[in-house]
Amino acid sequence: MLCTAGDGVCVILRLPRPKLHDRGGSVNTQYERYSFRSYPRDELMPLESAYRYGLDQYGTENWPDTVNYLEISLRLYRLLRDSEAFCNLNCSTVQMADVGLEGNVGGIKDGSHQARSLSEFAELRVFGDVLKRTQCLKRCKQGLPAFRKSQPSREVVEEFQRREPYKFLQYAYFKTNNLPKAIAAAHTFLLLHPDDEMMKRNMAYYKSIPESEVHIKDLETKTYETLFIRAVRAYNGENWRTSISDMEMALPDFFKTFEECIAACEGSREIKEFKDFYPNIADHYVEVLKCKLKCESNLTPIIGGFVVEKFVATMYHYLQFAYYKLNDVKNAAPCAASYLLFDHDDQVMKQNMVYYQYHKDKWELSDEHFKPRPEAVLFYNITTMQKELFDFAMQHLVDDDEGVVVEYLDELLEGNAF
């Protein structure tokens, strides 16, 4: 019995036991025609148009075109996110000082008692950097194909974030007798929707097919996930060097993916109401923060149906023990300190640190060896500050009670703030 997306109808299929022949190539080739820098011209179209057309074809049971356009829309979505991340990352450090306005503003000359550099005008400096960064982004986007077509609505983007296209793709694959991809698409959707009854029933049907397990793959898997799984398997087999090698590659790849994720959050925004200047800026930034705060959880692997809790900390946990087993305490101690950044109450890791410190002379450890690794500190600081800013906004920037505002203004007036 297989269920269809959209109406939730389950159809009893009286078919001979299907064979697992992949008519559309390996399930690993979901993005085989995808290239960020040289996207195929014949596929370049508005993301929303491709997606809506694919859904229309699904409604008319035109399964080949459903598959074609939904796959294209997935590649277009990846292109858009990669393009947003590319431009925002490359323009993230641009400042107004780069165009020579640092030392001479408004005709006031250096050396006079009135001389001021741009850095002394806090607001002008901030918005000068904003203008320069905007110029950089404009130039960058003009050269990328993803921005040459109309941009998708927020609702469509959110559907892709929820992996909704795979709900329709899995049935279209099934109807085109591409069971390997149908199984992979169903699994890909279920990873984010483990309680979806319709897809759970479909997956149960697929699993009843002999040799189906080999096709249970996440079509949106990231490189660091594969490296992490390999590292854990090596760890469980006590292959410490292999585990360390793969885990040390997984860490920077995760941080790179995380950086790209938060950069991609800085895309376009739909303005729904007009506000004063600063409240409008704050609203936009809070929306961006909300997106960025989802990156860590969205990038956390789901293995065997279970989320890897405290993923970054977990990688350092594996590393510190593997290094210790190789008697490489100079690398084990910083990993232990890095783990404690994210879980400072972990008693086992605290005991490990006490043990390392007690034997520091034996292993020739300095104070530097008991500090977290720089990339761990950077990730911790970014995620912590993002959460603090968002919490502040939720606490103080929601619609105020009129009486509270009056009391606050009274305090300002009493303090001669105006």
Residue ranges of predicted features:
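Short, charge-rich amphipathic alpha-helical segments embedded
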Residues: 24-25, 35, 63-103, 190-208, ...
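TPR-adjacent "capping" and linker segments in tetratricopeptide-repeat scaffold/adaptor proteins
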Residues: 33-48, 152-164, 212-225, 302-312
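Conserved small-residue packing positions in alpha-helical repeats and bundles
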Residues: 54, 170-172, 177, 187, ...
